[in-house]
Amino acid sequence: GLQQKNDHIWVHNCDFFYGDAGSDADQVKGDGALDTKTSTYVTHSYNHFWDNGKCNLQGMKSESTENYITYHHNWYDHSDSRHPRIRTCSVHIYNNYYDGNAKYGVGVTMGASAFVENNYFRNCNYPMLISKQGSDDLSGGTFSGENGGVIKACGNYITGAKAYTTYQQDPTGFDAYEVSNAKETVPSSVKAKQGGTTYNNFDTSSVMYSYTADSPEEAKEKVMARAGRVDGGDLKWTFDNSVDDASYAVNEALKAAIVAYKDSIVAIGSGFTDNNDPVVTTVTTSVKSTTTTVTTTQPQQTTTTTTSTVPVVGSDVIYVSPNGGGDGKSMNSPTDVLTAIKSVPAGGTIYLLDGTYKFSETILIKENNSGTAGKYKTISAYPGAKVKFDFSGQAVAGANRGFVLDGAYWHFYGFEIANAGDNGMLLSGDNNIIEMMIFNGNQDTGLQLSRYNTSYASVAEWPTNNLIKNCTSKNNCDDATMENADGFAAKLTCGEGNVFDGCMSYNNS
């Protein structure tokens, strides 16, 4: 959950299953699946909740500000309650699919204002509840006697509900104030029975964002197609509506499937395999086949195939090692990386052999050191090698980057850049590919995209058309202030056409 002082957060396309059982009887499926407390400007969308007992607690008793939260296109799939359960906050709830919910849908307490719009409620026992009035009184009270709030409802489709009462039907025992137009305001005469609070009409004020709500039927179709992980994830389950709609007990068969589940993830970005090695595939060069296969067969035994890597040779391949001093033409005679960077031709490959490359100064690839559109200059970890560039010898200073890539048409692949005195990499050139890289423990942003030449004043001169693909940036932190380092940063002097695809950033200051 989002526990304290978060703002401008988006949680989307997640699957939520059972948690560990708590000590209370109503926590047999775990406690809150996705709670949000003391946070504002938060959106929860396209998430899939699988038979959770308590989905979304929104707000704490101690909150006093009108935190603004949105829930849209979530699939509450046979989950029981708290979709969401709101204290004090201003919450927009639209285009969600409530699919067989044994207890209730939306609940408001402690002066909360909720706009519930164009949702699809199928067999949701009590679609909307206000504490201590209406259907909440009929159900014996759900919210520990807390004061009520006000719900504004518009355009919802409700079928199979046990009870739902509008203000127009009962102005003191209502579950929601129903409007026919989303722009209609709720008059101040509409008040919670216990607590006497009114609706704050946040949804028609200047704080409201622009959006277009789907019809409930369209929302249902979108939610079933798109909520949760891609293609519904790799755990498949079909509920029995005749049983599961009304049941709030643990579905033992579903629980067994969850407990037995084994994911098939190989890597997320880079740096996430079992041994934390970068995931490496062979880099394509103009050199022909780099492997041979030897097959040995013994009578009445299984055929065994072994594959060995044959060293690549050729004028466009350069080998380097941490202490290399050779000519770089073979693995047995590697050169140093600075020599290789200066001499590698367009279309050539620098293979980094296993080890830690220690530097106390920035490695600068100059603007005039570039490949071409058809012939990238590649610098790559040798297949299977674990390669790390360690810049811990640098002092902490704004100019002390690890790598500065000011050239064009370079392809960086499959190694780690760590402990620089500023950015791990400043990417200032054009048409480069940075792939499967790890930026770890640098004193400023792991990878920063911005100009290097400060005299370049126009967008046309700034870095353009770079692809940062499946990279990981972690643990980057400026020790002095603990607040300036990002995982990735596209700065003000960043050009057009740059793409971050499949990258992961975490634990940065």
Which residues does each PLM region occupy?
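Right-handed parallel beta-helix/beta-spiral solenoid domain characteristic of secreted/periplasmic
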Residues: G1, N332-T335, S370-N423, C477
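Feature marks extracellular polysaccharide-active and adherence modules
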Residues: Q3, H12, F17, K37, ...
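Parallel beta-helix/beta-solenoid
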Residues: Q3-N6, V11, K29, T38-S39, ...
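Long, contiguous C-terminal flanking segments immediately downstream of a protein's structured core
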Residues: F121-T282
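Extracellular mucin-like PTS domains
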Residues: T281-T309
